[in-house]
């Protein structure tokens, strides 16, 4: 019997901030930024390769996102839920985070809780970062939205986009709030050749 234990990347980041360390390390005091880079460029890439292979065959899916309150469903039921999601409109679970340029527009208009600071980011359509809530009746499973991309890439992307980007969702939908905040940071994205040779990523990022 194969039980695949999973967790959302946002929850991993929150645990980094609480002092928890990376996979199979004991570096609790490592700066949060360094933990994130290790996860983003190494651990999550390794894990995604394993996930892609196991997704069609595991017997049970274990959601460990809610600490101390795991949820488990049969693998067949989980895959059926992903199939249904791919065939209809769906909404990802958004998350909001403060930053150096953060403002107050999102806090006011989205009725966000007071955090003693600001809100700079809204991630609301990034399968690599956001999650989905799947209702199985007896339990609700929170699962990385990236799993849907891996399970049904052509249904989500179409043949042409899938041929170019493979099992990756090439668009990031997020909102940056600077209202009554600071100037937005200068962002520099490398050329495709550079990001491929230095970071082993398939494509670079353009912004609009």
Residue spans for each PLM region:
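Small-molecule kinase domains that catalyze NTP-dependent phosphoryl transfer to phosphate-bearing small molecules
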Residues: 18-79
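A residue-identity detector for tryptophan
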Residues: 10, 23, 44-46, 101, ...
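Conserved phosphate-donor/acceptor-positioning beta-strand/loop module used by diverse small-molecule
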Residues: 2-20, 24-28
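Short linear interaction motifs
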Residues: 1, 44, 167-169
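Transition-metal
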Residues: 58-63, 67-207
